[in-house]
Design a protein with these regions (language model features):
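Noncatalytic alpha-helical scaffold of FAD-dependent oxidoreductases
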Residues: 2-485
């Protein structure tokens, strides 16, 4: 295959941008766009005040990446936040963007890649929203350099639980809310717009897949990369990996490049995670690299049959997306189709185990050993990360300067006779706590209330709740994430 150079930058970086005011080349938010935004804020505040006072507040969104399934709320109990989806402004010189809180990272990446820029951390799935990643969980292979998405937020405008719209930044009146907003999962308020930092990119990413038969050796390499930010003399812009099972581990190192001897493409018939075993190196466009996991929802498209070549050839390409699979899972959960099928076949019941957990690097080998012994689910995603700042975030129990590895595992495991649903999830939670780690709250949690608040800084949370939602208009974090209300 012929090589590719940076002269094709516009085509390689992706489609045209999606945004609110239509003229991305402007150097400031247009007055018309600002008027539309302010009108949308006023309308949302009125809508919020009109919601029934005794009903939980929920957002009317077309997609979700949460795995805490709840009954659908009545239409008159939801907030229409569609007006807050769009990129309001990109400033290439300052390397910043002003973005609606409901903007998906797919739209945001398309808007910024046009200028050779990207957000500092782009979570793995296209329909994750910027507001969702900042108030919840967001991590990716650039997290070894850039930490978590909320660390590159400059300021944000938030609709708080008491109905105010406030501007929160690192300094100023609402600095405490700014730092306490991450990991609050919409229980303190909703981000309506955010100003974020961007970083320059090159058109391609050169990836190298390095195999390890020993997890200790794999973690030794993680430590070396975290210390040096290089490997074999090359800079490490991205770092993640896969555990396929005991004795088979891979680290994938990504480095920006302005040339590509060849290009691989994993949005159609080819499957990215399978390529990790097949190739020692590869080249992708930067856009395709950002979404390499989305096409097959990492590897979770398997139950839908789309990894079968015969089915995949017939499956419309536009439906090879994580949000499509997530809707299929939600449909199955709503109507209990898989449960009915298992009962008719007299198959053993299965427990859904969908978690992302962060473990300190020095304890990762212990967690991996536990996981293969007790959970026995493969593959497992490995994503080394380190906070970008030297100051902790109050509701995010991660220490500055410390290297962690995010373990992502998503699937079902069989329940043995006498084991209740939640058995394996509770095992994971206990082991994570023992090893000094924490888990993301986007999926069902089983903690007791006292333990939960000990892990997630209940004192700081309750003080923020009293300051910004004294009437408890929004759900409590424990009620939302554990009780599933």
């Amino acid at each position: 295959m012929t090589g590719v150079t940076g002269s094709r930058i516009a085509g390689v970086f992706g489609r045209g941008p999606v945004r609110a005011d239509g003229d991305l080349a402007s150097h400031e938010v247009s007055s018309a766009a600002l008027r539309r935004y302010r009108a949308a804020v006023d309308k949302l505040r009125s809508q919020y005040q009109a919601l029934p006072a005794d009903a939980p507040v929920r957002l009317a969104k077309p997609t979700s990446n949460l795995f805490r399934f709840r009954d659908t709320a009545p239409a008159d109990h939801t907030l229409d936040v569609s007006a807050f989806r769009g990129v309001l402004h990109v400033d290439p010189a300052a390397r910043t963007a002003v973005v609606g809180g409901m903007t998906t990272y797919e739209d945001l990446a398309d808007a910024t890649l046009r200028y050779g820029l990207m957000p500092l951390v782009v979570p793995q799935l296209k329909t994750i929203t910027l507001g969702g990643a900042v108030t919840g969980l967001g991590i990716e292979s650039s997290s070894i350099r850039n930490g978590l998405p909320h660390e590159s937020v400059i300021e944000m405008e938030i609709l708080t639980g008491d109905g105010r719209v406030v501007t929160a930044a690192r300094e100023g009146e609402h600095a405490r809310l700014f730092r306490g907003f991450p990991n609050s999962y919409g229980t303190l308020g909703y981000a309506l717009s955010l100003t974020i930092e961007l970083e320059p990119v090159q058109p391609y990413v050169h990836v190298r897949h390095r195999p390890f038969s020993s997890f200790h050796e794999c973690m030794s390499a993680v430590g070396q990369i975290a210390a040096d930010s290089t490997i074999d003399g090359a800079p490490v812009d991205f770092l993640d990996g896969i555990a396929f099972g005991p004795g088979e581990f891979y680290l994938t190192i990504g480095t920006f490049s302005d040339v590509a001897p060849w290009l691989s493409e994993y949005t159609g018939q080819q499957i990215y995670y399978k390529s990790v075993r097949r190739f020692r190196e590869d080249f992708l466009t930067t856009r395709d690299y950002l979404w390499r996991w989305d096409t097959d929802w990492f590897w979770c498209s398997r139950p839908f049959g789309v990894q079968n070549p015969a089915i995949r050839r017939l499956w419309p390409r536009r439906f090879l997306r994580s949000d499509v699979y997530r809707r299929l899972v939600a449909f199955d959960r709503r109507y209990g189709l898989t449960d009915q099928m298992n009962r008719s076949r007299r198959a053993s019941p299965r427990e859904m185990v969908i978690q992302d957990v962060e473990i300190p690097a020095e304890n990762c080998a212990d967690f991996m050993e536990f996981f293969f012994r007790e959970i026995r689910m493969t593959p497992v995603w490995l994503c080394p990360m380190r906070l970008r700042e030297d100051r902790a975030w109050p509701l995010y129990p991660l220490e500055p300067g410390r290297v962690y590895v995010n373990f992502g595992f998503w699937g079902t495991v069989p329940l043995s006779p006498g084991q209740a649903d939640g058995h394996h999830n509770r095992l994971v939670e206990r082991e994570v706590a023992t090893l000094g780690g924490s888990k993301g709250l986007y999926s069902t949690a089983y903690y007791g209330e006292e333990e939960f608040w000990r892990i997630y800084n209940g004192q700081e949370y309750q003080e923020l709740k009293r300051a910004y939602d004294p009437g408890r208009r929004l759900l409590d974090l424990y009620d939302k994430c554990v009780r599933g209300r």
